[in-house]
């Protein structure tokens, strides 16, 4: 089962372009990857403009056969797009007028997380705008009612903490296999 997500970027005009991402959309997976490997405005924009994807790696990559054997290939490092790599239609990026509209429409296909890269208002050492990642989440109460965050929260710290938990569980599983 997938943890679905949306990945968006807020443009200077205030509008948001975004696309769907199917696998490992939780903050310790996709969120951590976004914080670690997707800081460049042009790279993120180019990736989103390729449309909906199965997964995001660390690079946009090249067209590749989705059904081919991927052992020993660069597949794990590349994004895998529905149109470019699988030949599917009607899976381009979407445009929203603002953050509220993005949140309102971001959970229509079973997404659990919606990510947004936006300008922090700060400048980097070269005087260029600094961008960082934010997220909103959809979760269910014990009564089964869906609750969706109404405002974006900073992603980086939460993504790192969740990624550390994932690594700890992996180490525990390795230790259990050694004992067995």
Regions found by a protein language model. Name each.
Residues 37-180:
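Low-complexity intrinsically disordered segments
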Residues 31-37:
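An exposed acidic His-Trp-rich patch
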Residues 1-26, 30:
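Short, extreme N-terminal segment that most often corresponds to the first beta-strand
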